[in-house]
């Protein structure tokens, strides 16, 4: 009888804790999978239900792409660019400087097809590794609005950009998830 009561109590506490964590964080860790690239030295969590996309023939520097199986225009990508090996992220400027430079590069390269607006730029330090979180609103083509959240850092002479993208009208729905996923990105 005592064992049955104890087992029931453990199950109830576990369920209550999982509901509480999901309600507080908006995303249960069980709903995320880990991706690790040991060659380039980075890893991140991505949502269950997202699948890898073949990047053969993609733009230079695109290392990996995942997209949602259902919301097909929600995706994440990792883009790697070479930089001098002695450069750190802070050598490239503040989060706002780097964010504006990315925005200008996108806007200049798109020939009017894509216009990005920097909404927010923040820096975070994890054990001496600096990351910039950059948030953009992007207007694509004929008034298609998108929302991007990027985490940027340097590692081994490379600038690594981890970017999540969704339709603007889905942003409020996925913001908590995207924040969790972007924060999970780190290099080693």
UniProtKB/Swiss-Prot annotation:
Monomer. Present in about 3% of photosystem II (PSII) preparations. Purifies with partially assembled PSII complexes, in addition to a small amount of monomeric and dimeric PSII, and trimeric PSI. It holds the Pfam family PsbP. Belongs to the PsbP family. CyanoP subfamily. A lipid is attached at residue 24 (N-palmitoyl cysteine). GO terms for biological process: photosynthesis. PROSITE patterns: PROKAR_LIPOPROTEIN. Disruption phenotype: Wild-type growth in BG11 medium, 30 degrees Celsius 30 umol photons/m(2)/s; slightly reduced growth in Ca(2+) or Cl(-) deleted medium. Up to 40% decreased rates of O(2) evolution. Increased accumulation of unprocessed, partially processed and processed D1 protein (psbA); fragmentation of thylakoid membrane proteins PsbE, chlorophyll synthase ChlG, and membrane protein insertase YidC. Its main location: membrane. GO terms for cellular component: extrinsic component of membrane; photosystem II oxygen evolving complex; plasma membrane-derived thylakoid membrane. The keyword Cell cycle does not apply. It is a lipid-anchor. Residues 1-23 form the signal peptide. It comes from Synechocystis sp. (strain ATCC 27184 / PCC 6803 / Kazusa). A lipid is attached at residue 24 (S-diacylglycerol cysteine). This is CyanoP. InterPro entries: Mog1/PsbP_a/b/a-sand (IPR016123), PsbP_C (IPR002683).
